[in-house]
Amino acid sequence: MRSVKYILLVLLLLPAMQQVHADDIGLWAEAGFSKSISKKFSWGMEAGMRTGDDFGLISRIDIGASVSYKPVKFLKLTAGYALIFDHERMEINEHFNSRGKMNGYNINKSFWRPKNRLYFDVSGKLPIGRFSFTLRERYQYTRYPSVSYDREKYRGLVSDGYTGKQYGGYALDEETLEHKKLKQKHYLRSKLTAEYDIHHCPLTPFVSAEISNDFSDGFAVVKQRYTAGVDWKIKKKHVITLGYVYTNGHDDDVDGNIHAISVGYNFKF
């Protein structure tokens, strides 16, 4: 049990050690269930949410479903769909005139943007003693519909007696409705996971590393994600997952360095 306590201690300390270097730290929570249709087929559903800075405002909500097929014991094929709503934060940009002198601000108001995601997985699992290693290759397609949002333009320094709307000492000049065009993204996400089965213990520690390649950008690596955590089998069909996630890169889900605590629950029928 000492090794288990050490693993849990490390998981609790990791976010604190990394927080100084993070652009963002939040909570990723999800819950789902899965049900076997036969020995080879199963299906499931899940829902999740993510927060932004310091466990603050919700930045993402998602719900999805998937179907899996195991032609042989060590191989699994999965197809799934997810509906995701991303919260785009308010964006404040300085505005400069043709001579390079600042003359106001452009403020894009916050808004929610939906996206539809399809994915197809091929996963292979290799047990070695009490360790098991899983390699998952995922093709992921994401479609963003067009969306509109509000923009406020502030120009001209505020004079004494001004009672209108202002920001940073500049008066509101114009409010416009802006548009983001439809876009589509194609990625290959490769993930390697290692687990360790502790004898007569309900806790299974794991670590994973994942990279994302962008098909539309010469197959460039655009994101890396590293996870350390533990699965706690509280009952035969109930599993709680606690972990720490570090993500670095720029794709359709993240932008910059993100540190998060992940919490999950899964029920198997």
Regions found by a protein language model. Name each.
Residues A31-K35, A65-Y69, F120-G124, Y139, ...:
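Residues on the lipid-exposed face of transmembrane beta-strands in outer-membrane beta-barrel proteins
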Residues Q19-A22, T51-G56, I107-R113, L177-K183, ...:
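Outer-membrane beta-barrel domain signature
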Residues E137-V239, V245-T247, F269:
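Outer-membrane beta-barrel transmembrane domain signature
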Residues I25-L27, S59-I61, P114-L118, L182-L188, ...:
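Residues that define the transmembrane beta-barrel architecture of outer-membrane proteins
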Residues M1-L27, F269:
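Bacterial Sec-dependent N-terminal signal peptides
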Residues K40-M45, F74-A79, G129-F133, H200-T204, ...:
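Repeated loop/turn-to-beta-strand initiation elements of outer-membrane beta-barrel proteins
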Residues A47-D53, Y81-H87, P114, L126-I128, ...:
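Transmembrane beta-strands of outer-membrane beta-barrel pores
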Residues A22-E88:
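Start-of-domain marker
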